[in-house]
Amino acid sequence: MKSITVTQSAVQKCAQLLERANSVGVLTGAGISTSAGIPDFRGPQGLYVTRRYDPDTIFDINYFYANPAPFYEFAHDFIGLEATIEPTFAHRFLAHLEMIGKIKGIVTQNIDSLHQMAGSQNVLEMHGSFWRSFCLVCAQEYSFEIMKHKLAQENVVHCPCGGVIKPDIVFFGENVKFMDEAIHLAEKTDLFLVIGTSCVVYPAALVPTYASGDIVIINKSLVDLPRGNVVLQAQEDIDEFFKNIAALLQVKISDN
C-alpha cells in the first residue's frame, strides 16, 4: 500500500486548536466516507458515473411519486454497500471527541449513518438516511433491517397497505432537515470543523458561514469559503490527517 504523508504543521495547528477549544461543531460530507467504501456520488468513481444514475431523476421527489423504480435501482446498490461497510478512523475519532465532551454536535450531509455506527450521539442528518423508512400512504415506519429484507424480495418496496415505502432521505423538492439546529451549533461553538465536503450543495454549504469561532477545513480538494474566520485549510487525506492528530494528542482509537 502506498504510504500517505500529511503536512505536520497543519496537524500541529489543528491539534492545538482542538486542545484549546471548549466546544467544537462539525460539518461532514461524502469525503469522510469514501475510505469506508462508499464512492463520492459525483466523483470520477461515484455511483452516478459508474452506474449511470441521473441524480436529477432518482432524487426528484415528484419523479419518485410518479415512478419510484429508478430510485430503487440505486437503493439496491447503496443498501448493499451500507450492509458491508464500517466507520472510518475519522468517524471514530470524532466519536471519541464527542465522548470526552469536546464535540457538541455533528452536522452531516451523508445518508450512510456511519457517524452513529461509530458511536456519535448528537448527529444532525440534513439529508436524512436509510436508517428508517415510511409508507407514503399509512406512514408505517420500517427499520433498516426490514428494508434490507424487503429489498431482497421486491424491486420497488411496498407496505402491506399497498403504499410505496420511501426511505427517510431528503429528495430534491423537499426541505433539508435540522437547518435551524445546524446554524445554532455553528453559532454557539468556538471551533468549527468542515470535513470532506466541498461546500457546493446548498443549503448545507451555508452552515459554516454562521460559525462564530475559528473554522478548520480538512478536504482533499480546495474549499471555497469566505476567508473570514477560516484559520486552517488542510488539503489532506482525512483518515491520515486525524491519525496524525490522534498520535500527537496521545489518543488511542480502537480498530474496527
Task: Tell me what each language-model feature is.
Residues M1-N256:
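Conserved catalytic core of sirtuin-type NAD+-dependent deacylases
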